[in-house]
Amino acid sequence: MKFRAIAALTALLLFAPAFGTPRATEAAADKKDLAAELDALKSQVVQLAHQAQDADDYIAIANLQRAYGYYVDKCLWDETADLFAKDGSLEIGLRGVYAGQDHVRKYLHTLPKLEYGMLFNHMQLQPVIDIAPDGKTAWGRWRAFEQFGMLHKAAQWGEGTYENEYVKEDGVWKIKKLHYYMTYYVDYYKGWDQGGLPAPGPLKDFPPDQPTTVQYKLFPDVFVPPYHYKNPVTGK
């Protein structure tokens, strides 16, 4: 028995250093590095997924605003109103604020229907879209270039800036707030060098729910609609 105990102790002493060899240490380090690399890859996947979602949201918001322009062009007022959230609002020029999708719809139906010889173009241009980190709200600044006219009767140019808010409901982007600041509204034949027409005020037959939020004058006066975003270079 004593011989066996001595033999076992000798074997233990001979092989004990193997448990602390550099090879074992390297394996442990490799395992630790692999875990760190996997964590980094997971973080990168999450970041890429977020960027991909932002890109999808950007496209959806841009299509939403462009659809608005196309529907307004053809006086499709129900289709236009359907783009708004239930608690959405609309403010055009100095006409005041119409609150709620139902009132937005009623206001739109006070506008003319498309008929022969009528031009009512509202081109949606130059978007700057910012999406909130939570992906549920967004803001967009757009420019509209407009052509109005009735065959052999009248023709006008129009231009202005949108500062809008959007909301994502059940995975679908909708207009939360549409605010259109008019820059000019002029007679086609006189042009903008002869001055402009005044901005239309509130409707008497269907007054707004709230007064105009920002008072301003159209061209030739100077007015800069407030920006929702900071300077992308300076951050100011």
Which residues does each predicted region cover?
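Short, surface-exposed coil-to-beta transition loops
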Residues: 122-124, 156-162
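Bacterial N-terminal signal peptides
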Residues: 8-18
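A hydrophobic membrane-anchoring alpha-helix module
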Residues: 192-236
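Short beta-strand edge/turn micro-motifs at domain boundaries
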Residues: 137-139, 159-192
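A solvent-exposed, acidic/Ser-Thr-rich amphipathic alpha-helical stretch
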Residues: 77-146
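Bacterial N-terminal signal peptides that target proteins for export
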Residues: 1-8
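Beta-strand elements of well-folded, non-transmembrane domains
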Residues: 144-148, 166-168
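Short, low-complexity N-terminal intrinsically disordered segments enriched in polar/charged residues
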Residues: 25-70, 74, 82-83
